[in-house]
């Protein structure tokens, strides 16, 4: 399967979902590290709808995994595994939400302002130009999305390891545009949070204190609707905890402890 990376040895009971949407390969260092102790899958999301990506994940789990599985999701991937756990609770042991976007719209309104305020005038102008391009319904420009992600990386991270620059991410602008448009509307309408009431498994959210996505936008809404929910805030940490110089060790300690419970 071209859209699947495997780490460690079977049985595969841990799966790591990447962000973006459409940023395949972004969690490879995380999946590889976790795979040193267990079988881990890193699937690439290829479908252009939220439901399509959920079903694609189900097919991967049913074909390659030994349910029940532990699902980790980063950024958009956190929403994906959350939605998956709500629909297919019988397949899931627990989920770990890493650097999730906020679950209610009012928490999301200030994210871009935080990012822009961390940039210089030239970079800020370029981000605004790229945002206009990314809103184009005909967009198929991987280079524009890649440049946008690099500029966001300047604002989203606290102190990244040098290795972060060498992570190969396969950008798909069409997936980003299509899936994010649908997912953000789910948040705006309240459907995203409401769906989580169907989750029956334990949920752990891990978040960096420097991440422009506000931690309270994850902790507060999920605390209201989930029966078994824990939240851990990492200090001096941005949007990619496993690549953060100061938070990496604590991040892996938290995640490994949670995986050992599964």
How should each PLM-predicted stretch be described?
Residues 199, 205-207:
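Short beta-strand/loop motif that positions the catalytic acidic residue
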Residues 96-133:
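Flexible "cap/lid" loop of the alpha/beta hydrolase fold
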């Amino acid at each position: 399967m071209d859209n699947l990376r495997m780490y460690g040895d079977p049985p595969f009971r841990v799966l790591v979902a990447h962000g973006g949407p459409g940023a395949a390969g972004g969690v490879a260092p995380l999946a590889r590290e976790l795979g040193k102790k267990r079988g881990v899958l890193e699937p690439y999301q290829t479908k252009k709808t939220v439901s399509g990506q959920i079903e694609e994940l189900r097919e991967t789990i049913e074909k390659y995994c030994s349910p029940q599985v532990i699902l980790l999701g980063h950024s958009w991937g956190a929403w994906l595994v959350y939605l998956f756990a709500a629909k297919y609770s019988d397949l899931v042991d627990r989920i770990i939400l890493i650097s999730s976007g906020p679950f209610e719209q009012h928490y999301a309104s200030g994210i871009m302002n935080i990012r822009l305020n961390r940039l210089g005038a030239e970079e800020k102008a370029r981000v605004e130009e790229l945002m206009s391009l990314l809103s184009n319904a005909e967009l198929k420009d991987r280079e524009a999305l890649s440049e946008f992600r690099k500029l966001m990386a300047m604002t989203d991270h606290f102190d990244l390891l040098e290795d972060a620059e060498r992570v190969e991410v396969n950008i798909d602008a069409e997936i980003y545009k299509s899936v994010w448009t649908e997912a953000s509307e789910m948040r705006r309408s309240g459907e995203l949070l409401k769906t989580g009431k169907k989750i029956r498994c334990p949920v752990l959210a891990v978040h960096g204190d420097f991440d422009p996505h506000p931690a309270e936008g994850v902790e507060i809404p999920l605390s209201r609707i989930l029966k078994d929910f824990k939240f851990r805030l990492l200090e001096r940490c941005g949007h990619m905890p496993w690549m953060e110089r100061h938070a990496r060790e604590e991040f892996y300690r938290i995640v490994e402890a949670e995986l050992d419970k599964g």
